[in-house]
Amino acid sequence: MLNDLYHMLDPVAISAGPITIYWYGLAYVVGALLTAVVMYRTQRRWGFDITVDDLTSVVVGVVFGLIIGARLFYVIFYGDGYYWAHPLEIFATNEGGMSFHGGLVGGIIGGVLVCRMYKLDAWTIADLAVIGAPLALCLGRCANFVNGELWGKPTDLPWGVIFGGTAGDMPRHPSQLYEAFLEGIVLFCILQVLSRKKPLLPQGTFMGVFVMGYGIVRFLIEFVRVPDAQLGYLLGGVITMGQLLSLPLVIAGLALIIFARRRNQPQRIYLAA
């Protein structure tokens, strides 16, 4: 059934004359909007009142930082020298090649810069952002599935999908959907439950849970996901680049949770004048 569904899907969502809109691009836009809505509703539930203009500025800053960071990390860590020989290809984002780890770093930098401009507390803003971010991750992974990219290893399970092309004609794990469910829906539910705890959890807690949760899921999913062809397995064939980049996230996330608990700084939207 899942295999039949995949072959019914088209990477192009809308095509009208010279205008072509892909599901992958829509995933970014809708994901950003959903994250903004969750941020706004959560901060209202927490008793705060961020202005729509300030929230919009934060989201725009994060999205720009995310896209730049995601692309640069892919070029540096996954390009295997290709982009140094073809520098103009760095800007060909329509051909794919984005890294979550770079997107996380770039998004944080973009968000912090905007927070400084508008005197927003970056810790609380980051916590609010990651509460809704799993929805964007879920949509992004679903778009990966529609595009037939980042597929898994061969499997004889009934939900295996024949992606064709370079993936061949054998059924494979739909690893994109595994990630959509675990790092998307499951992580979103966990963060939603935590966001409703009283009293509010201290600044940095949600960011720590998100980073650690993603790192754990990504590290485990890599066992059933085919590594990037240009890199394969690293360190003697025991680990993938995705796992190598995810291990620090698990450690950093756990450290951030411990730090947040010891710091015990209450949530706030705006910095004191």
Stretches found by the model and what they are:
Residues 1-273:
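Hydrophobic, membrane-interfacing alpha helices
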